[in-house]
């Protein structure tokens, strides 16, 4: 995969391809540190969206996400849900240097198959920026509902 080696999207100009535009998390650094688990799960009819949050502490931060490194395991049935892709991108692997976003929270949004009814406890295997982690979570603790838009 041949990506630009460094991206400065602080001005979010039209020249930057859409798949590289950086979306910042709708939270403060304090809210991030107060989270029990640095992730949200949104259940939709056709898919499950898992948003993992990463603190960007440096002026230049290497973002490296490969969908093959992510899975959800139902702790009761041992069913495994493999990551389908990165939300908003056709790429299965993205890697780039994020510049000028020091002290911000970066969301990594991953698409999974829809979770079966009755799923309560999950193990989420992650590997962002070559840091493997497993989060054991209760679905009700990390379930996030998007605000409604009323017209």
Give residue spans per PLM region.
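Conserved functional micro-motifs across diverse proteins
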Residues: 1-151
């Amino acid at each position: 995969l041949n990506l630009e080696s460094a991206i400065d999207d602080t001005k979010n100009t039209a020249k930057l391809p859409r798949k590289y535009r950086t979306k910042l998390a709708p939270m403060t650094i304090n809210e991030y540190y107060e989270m029990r688990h640095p992730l949200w799960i949104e259940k939709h009819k056709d898919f499950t969206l898992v948003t993992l949050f990463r603190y960007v502490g440096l002026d230049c931060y290497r973002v490296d996400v490969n969908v093959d490194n992510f899975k959800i395991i139902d702790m009761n049935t041992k069913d495994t849900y493999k990551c389908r892709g990165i939300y908003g991108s056709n790429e299965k692997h993205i890697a780039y240097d994020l510049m000028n976003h020091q002290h911000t929270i970066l969301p990594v949004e991953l698409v999974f198959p829809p979770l079966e009814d009755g799923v309560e406890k999950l193990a989420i295997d992650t590997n962002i920026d070559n840091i493997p982690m497993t989060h054991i979570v209760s679905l009700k603790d990390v379930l996030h509902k998007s605000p409604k838009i009323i017209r």
